[in-house]
Amino acid sequence: MSRVGKSPIALQGAEVKLADGAITVKGPLGTITQPVNPLVNVANNDGTLNLAPVNESREANAMSGTMRAIIANAVHGVTKGFERKLTLVGVGYRAQAQGDKLNLSLGFSHPVVHQMPEGVKAETPTQTEIVIKGINKQQVGQVAAEVRGYRPPEPYKGKGVRYSDEVVILKETKKK
């Protein structure tokens, strides 16, 4: 059995409902509905969730660990939420959040406007910082990757959009 799949999930004040092949996790920040793989059994035991594979096949063992991680992320998302911080490095690089849009000035001849999907918010504490927040970990990471993709950090000066915890290794310039 998967080592990840063995450990129970503490619900931390979230409500869980199991119905027709899907699990609904409800918390103070919102609700996430996730389909449950048929190779995994889910049991709710007084504030904890236990997952077990249906049989001892490799696929069922692997899916029990995967489903445990997905459900644990859903519980964390609806109780505490997820956030990803981005930093803009470069002269004239600016960001501004306006409602469900993120306006970026990244050295192009035109401003870049990124439309935020439903359930994901962007905040700009300063002009060179972006904080992306939401309850769905996958969605928050995807939006952060899309914003970073507009101008990834280049290897010579490090200019571009980077994650706040990202370390950009700079190359040395060509010498005569």
From Swiss-Prot:
UniProt organism field: Burkholderia vietnamiensis (strain G4 / LMG 22486) (Burkholderia cepacia (strain R1808))
Gene Ontology molecular functions: rRNA binding; structural constituent of ribosome
Pfam name, any one: Ribosomal_L6
This protein's GO CC annotations: cytosolic large ribosomal subunit
Coiled-coil portions: none
Signal peptide per UniProt: none
Keywords recorded for this protein, A-Z: Ribonucleoprotein, Ribosomal protein, RNA-binding, rRNA-binding
Subunit architecture: Part of the 50S ribosomal subunit.
HAMAP family linked: Ribosomal_uL6_B
Known role: This protein binds to the 23S rRNA, and is important in its secondary structure. It is located near the subunit interface in the base of the L7/L12 stalk, and near the tRNA binding site of the peptidyltransferase center.
Phylogenetic lineage: Bacteria, Pseudomonadati, Pseudomonadota, Betaproteobacteria, Burkholderiales
UniProt protein name: Large ribosomal subunit protein uL6
